[in-house]
Amino acid sequence: FPDKDIIEFPFTEEKMNLSGALFDKDKLHNICKNELSKLSEEELYDFLYDWAKENEPEYVEKWFGDREKMLQILRLYMGVGAKRRRKDLMYAKQIFELISYFFDGESAEEMDEFKLDEDMVSKILKSYLAKYDHNDDNSVWFNKLKEIADEHGFASDMKAYKANPENFKGNVSDIAEAVRIAVTGRANTPDLWTIVHIMGEEQMTERIKKHIK
């Protein structure tokens, strides 16, 4: 056995086989995905906090200043506490990049483009804010998206849209996508109703107003 502490033996790749399993990123990432999915809510929170404190100390207060907000985000994105856990996230930096839009001053590196033209997006977002009530549950909230669809010539009924798509400008999913991109900068996210309730009405409204002409 060596008689010196391990820290006195600096790690070097020079005499190692770089094609071995230790340097196989795919295998390493696969292990990380599985291990992250096993962490409890508190363990995952602590893991991310420790990583941020060491690697991104300037963001610690922003990310972790509201403990309950971060826990809600992790429940949504990682499935913490749910029957099915998300198993495609591999490391802390990836997770923070994914959830960055929840925090003011941060956004996706490249905002996804709206499929609809600016005028239509503006009209949809105006209607959305006019009808929005933060106390609405998910069902009532989505029914209001359907109302907006009908008001602007989009199909609220997917069966009707599939039967005669030429009769409509689009469907209710296009309405939801316009709101989603305005709020998060991304066309694909987890449940939008949950996202806006984690963010809060004020933050959501400020972001939407930036896209209203």
Located regions from the model:
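Alpha-helix C-capping/helix-to-loop hinge sites
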Residues: I31-E35, K131-Y132, H152, A182
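Short amphipathic alpha-helical segments and their helix-coil junctions
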Residues: K4-F11, L74, S100, G105-E106, ...
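Charged substrate- and nucleic-acid-binding regions of tRNA-handling and nucleotidyl-transfer enzymes
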Residues: K146-K213
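Residue-level detector of well-ordered alpha-helical segments, enriched
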Residues: K27, L44, Y91, W141, ...
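Long, amphipathic alpha-helical coiled-coil segments characteristic
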Residues: E113-D157
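Catalytic adenosine-cofactor/nucleotide-binding cores of aminoacyl-tRNA synthetases and other
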Residues: F1-E110, F114, T184-K213
